Amino acid sequence: MSHEIFEQAKPILKKIQNKGFKAYFVGGSVRDYIMQRPIHDVDITTSATPDEIESIFDKTIPVGKEHGTINVVFQNDNYEITTFRSEDEYIDHRRPSEVYFVRDLYQDVQRRDFTMNAIAMDLNYRLYDYFNGQQDINNRVIRTVGVPSERFSEDALRIIRGLRFQSQLNFQIDSDTLHAMSSQISDIQYLSVERVVVELKKLIMGNNVKQSFEVMQNMKAFNYIPFFKSFEMSHLHIDEPITFELWIAILIVQQPKDIQLSTLKISNQEKATIKKWVTLIQTLPKIQSKQSLITLVYDYNLNDIEILLSLHHLLKQNGLTTANHLIINEISIREANEKLPIHCRKELAINGKDILNHTNKNSGPWLKDTLREIEIAVISNQIVNTKEEILEWVDAHVKI
């Protein structure tokens, strides 16, 4: 069975093969193809060295040439092509001391993390499965390639990746693999927090997050991760997928600590989102009327009903005060959203410049306050969202 994303990349494999080298699709794209899951990009592995790949293709980017990876730009798409490689002893539980380029596919896939990710596929969709990865996929089992303790000693991030796959794919972890994870969990303290957070963001949004989160708690994994080790993670209950930012916000409100978000090495946008969720969580108990709910839905752009319902559930589950269920429920949230005449300040019929021209005043803090009062008046249906009516209302109600 063909697949569009592989068909688009076939010419790359053909071009490499025409030069006398081997080339295969490998990793997550092959796994997802077997599972009939959405495929977003493909990884290609080859017997050609990075220098040879650069000589074959016109446009290349040496993103990780020293580790065997060349980015090939083909028909306006980027493809990562990595040379078959073998690795020397790992240092710091995260990177090999030396990488060797090899010409044999088996040598390459035997260094990979899990059997389901160690399957290669040629351009004719023939599979090369040396470690029974298809069988493990069919049985929904996560198992390391070879000895679990060796794989996790090479890169401790594989422990978190395994738990992330459990959450995303709803697979069970092989008992030997799980035992090695638990025995070597302290090694994740040597990882950069950025690498761990990338995996946690995916884990917390998986459909099987409840089981994976509990496994992490039982292993005391959070004791070895910056930021999280400052909290009592056993007190937190997560039984449904949520965003990373919402997870952190619930944790901060549940257990107030003087811990900087910068410890997580996340973006300023993510920090702002977390702070927004913290404020929302602290605001929810104050929602006592339909009008206050309408204002809340407007202020936080809560047009995704499921997010607010999920938050409401998680707060109750974690012993945090939230709004009365008679005020916040699916029907009331939907009604509040539908009643909003506008959904953001940009939809107001006037802007700050209009008010300045109308009042002949200089700009200042009063302008921001006035715009806020106008927003409340419009969303509470005190006035219709037209320029004329808003300016009349300003003249009559706003002290400037």
UniProtKB/Swiss-Prot annotation:
GO terms for molecular function: ATP binding; CCA tRNA nucleotidyltransferase activity; magnesium ion binding; tRNA binding. It catalyses: a tRNA precursor + 2 CTP + ATP = a tRNA with a 3' CCA end + 3 diphosphate; a tRNA with a 3' CCA end + 2 CTP + ATP = a tRNA with a 3' CCACCA end + 3 diphosphate. CDD domains: NT_ClassII-CCAase. It is an enzyme of class 2 (transferase). Keywords: ATP-binding, Magnesium, Metal-binding, Nucleotide-binding, Nucleotidyltransferase, RNA repair, RNA-binding, Transferase, tRNA processing. Its cofactor is Mg(2+). CTP binds at G28, R31, R112, D155, R158, R161, R164. One of its GO terms (biological process) is RNA repair. Its EC number is 2.7.7.72. Pfam families: PolyA_pol, PolyA_pol_RNAbd, tRNA_NucTran2_2. Mg(2+) binds at D41, D43. It comes from the Bacteria. ATP binds at G28, R31, R112, D155, R158, R161, R164. HAMAP family: CCA_bact_type3. NCBIfam families: PRK13299.1 (NF009814). Belongs to the tRNA nucleotidyltransferase/poly(A) polymerase family. Bacterial CCA-adding enzyme type 3 subfamily. A single active site specifically recognizes both ATP and CTP and is responsible for their addition. Catalyzes the addition and repair of the essential 3'-terminal CCA sequence in tRNAs without using a nucleic acid template. Adds these three nucleotides in the order of C, C, and A to the tRNA nucleotide-73, using CTP and ATP as substrates and producing inorganic pyrophosphate. tRNA 3'-terminal CCA addition is required both for tRNA processing and repair. Also involved in tRNA surveillance by mediating tandem CCA addition to generate a CCACCA at the 3' terminus of unstable tRNAs. While stable tRNAs receive only 3'-terminal CCA, unstable tRNAs are marked with CCACCA and rapidly degraded. This is CCA-adding enzyme. It comes from Staphylococcus epidermidis (strain ATCC 35984 / DSM 28319 / BCRC 17069 / CCUG 31568 / BM 3577 / RP62A). The gene is cca.
